[in-house]
């Protein structure tokens, strides 16, 4: 099964995309992963630098579609805000229409 992961990529600690990718690949799944945000460290430390990657994520998904890359399951994790949430909802709705 190929799983598309959309979530934050954190520079410190094995959390979010780093953890999910590791666990799912260890269980034999193929993983396609794109960050919703790049975050310097876990948020529990009190402060973090963050880069919203919505534009990159959308361009990457368009590229993958042109290349014929497909997925069987979708995971959406960390969302940076309302604008990104709206786009991620569109992705989820399109996946649902395809039976995912």
List each language-model region with its residue ranges.
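Ribokinase/PfkB-type carbohydrate-kinase core domain
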Residues: 2-14, 18-100
């Amino acid at each position: 099964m190929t799983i598309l992961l959309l979530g934050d990529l954190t520079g410190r600690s094995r959390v979010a995309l780093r953890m999910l990718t590791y666990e799912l690949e260890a269980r034999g799944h193929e993983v396609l992963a794109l960050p919703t945000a790049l975050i310097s460290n876990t948020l529990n430390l009190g402060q973090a630098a963050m880069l919203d990657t919505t534009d990159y994520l959308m361009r990457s998904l368009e590229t993958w579609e042109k290349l014929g890359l497909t997925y069987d399951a979708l995971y959406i994790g960390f969302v940076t805000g309302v604008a990104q949430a709206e786009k991620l909802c569109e992705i989820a709705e399109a996946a649902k229409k395809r039976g995912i």
